Regions:
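A glycine-rich helix N-cap at a beta->alpha junction
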Residues: 1-11
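Metal-dependent amide/peptide-bond hydrolase catalytic core
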Residues: 9, 16, 22-180
Length: 180
């Protein structure tokens, strides 16, 4: 065996450098009440969620000019937002699920910390979801490029998607991504 090939559509180019992938969820706590009370601005879990979402998008924008070869910025998405019961009840809880794809070499845990920095402790519960390294996971890109060369495969530029090849590489196996 010379290495591992993970099959993904790559236009017949060998991918040796996709992004990191990370996801998380954050549950916001509020104090229920009737919306006729002026406490809704402060107590609504949905309002806390909205402030977090705004700050998270601003955090992602700060990375717009960061580059790794042909990759740019932090790919960030708020994928699911839920909470509340109805318009005249102050929301006691709300939840946001989000994902992001840092550039290779960026630490997803630092970004999690930055995303949650402006949230008030005790008013939310944060849970990390799926987190996986970039490829190459162990700074061994020369070995991955050599594997592609041995197989006479043309190299791809770094790509935005993530694949399981990074997990094989993190476990010590040379792994590339290749497919039609």
């Amino acid at each position: 065996y010379q290495g591992i090939i993970v099959a993904e559509p790559t236009n017949n180019l060998a991918v040796t450098c996709p992004r990191v992938i990370a996801s998380g969820s954050i549950r916001f706590h509020g104090t229920s009440g009737h919306s006729s009370e002026n406490s809704a601005l402060k107590n609504s879990a949905i309002h806390k969620q909205a402030r977090w979402s705004f700050n998270a998008l601003e955090t992602a924008r700060k990375y717009e000019n960061k580059k790794y070869e042909s990759l740019e910025g932090l790919a960030f998405n708020i994928g699911s937002v839920s909470g509340g019961i109805k318009p005249n009840i102050i929301a006691q809880s709300a939840e946001t699920k989000f994902g992001f794809r840092p550039l290779p070499g960026q630490d997803p845990f630092e970004i999690f910390t930055e995303l949650n920095a402006k949230s008030v402790k005790g008013q939310f519960d944060f849970t990390t979801g799926f987190i996986a390294p970039s490829l190459p996971a162990k700074n061994n890109s020369h070995r991955l490029k050599a594997l592609a060369g041995k197989l006479k495969l043309e190299l791809s530029k770094p790509v935005n998607f993530w694949t399981e090849a990074a997990l094989f590489n993190e476990a010590g196996y040379d792994a590339i991504v290749f497919g039609p």
